Amino acid sequence: MKSVLFLIGAVLSALASPGSSAAAEEPLPKYGPQARRLFEDRQYFREHEAVDFWALVGYYVPQRNDSSCSLASAVMVLNALRAGEALSAAEELVTQDGLLQRVSSSIWNENTAAGGPGVSLDQFAALMERALAEYAIDARVEVVHVDEADPDALREVLSANEANAGDFLIANFLQSEFTGDPAGAVGHMAPVAAYDAAAGRVLLFDPDRRWYEPYWVTVETLLAGMGTRDGAAGRARGYLRVVRTD
């Protein structure tokens, strides 16, 4: 009887405990195999001018909540576009609150509030055009949906962007494709801060600062993340290219 009770107790204990399989599972690393932290690999900036990186880094801000990555990305790029200007003492830098007030869009205000759905790539393009006008920045916005994977075409865009201080890219992607965290399987946006052509990788200033810091991903990984389908928009994600025209 005692042996039977012992056996029953052992079984119940195993069932009640997270135990063998679940408890033994190792937690996922902060970054999956697709991403490499800037802290671990910054040699590129010792050997290259990296004009976009230096224009953006002073304005690298966190998103305010899980829905406002477009807003934080816009703030970084708008400030970077004005980095070469001599602003007056009365002129504020672009902030997330200030940007929402000046653009005054119900879509941007409501969709980037806590719990909101965020904005699609096409919505973001229209909002960026309004933001450029509000801040009197002479620039155009180009929208590219990655409907077909073409790494060579993307490399050409990245190379031109890296050599030009007057244009910036904002990627729209499925975050889990980069970080490896299945909890991050959501649409996301982040500026491209640098392109290391020799290594075939890009640096992203991910505004999800609660969890991440700047990280590198390969061109192929970038393309895979941008080529995912935005279910709400009904088409593939992609990127914005914002180009000064003056």
What are these regions (language model features)?
Residues 64, 189, 237:
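Extracellular structured ligand-interaction cores
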Residues 26-150, 231-232, 243-246:
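Cysteine-nucleophile protease catalytic domains, especially the papain-like/related folds used
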Residues 1-4:
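Positively charged n-region of N-terminal signal peptides that target proteins for export
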Residues 17-24:
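Signal peptide processing junction and immediate N-terminal pro/mature segment
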Residues 7-14:
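Bacterial N-terminal signal peptides
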Residues 148-205:
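Active-site-adjacent substructure of cysteine-protease-like catalytic cores
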Residues 196-246:
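Noncatalytic regulatory segments and standalone regulatory/sensor domains
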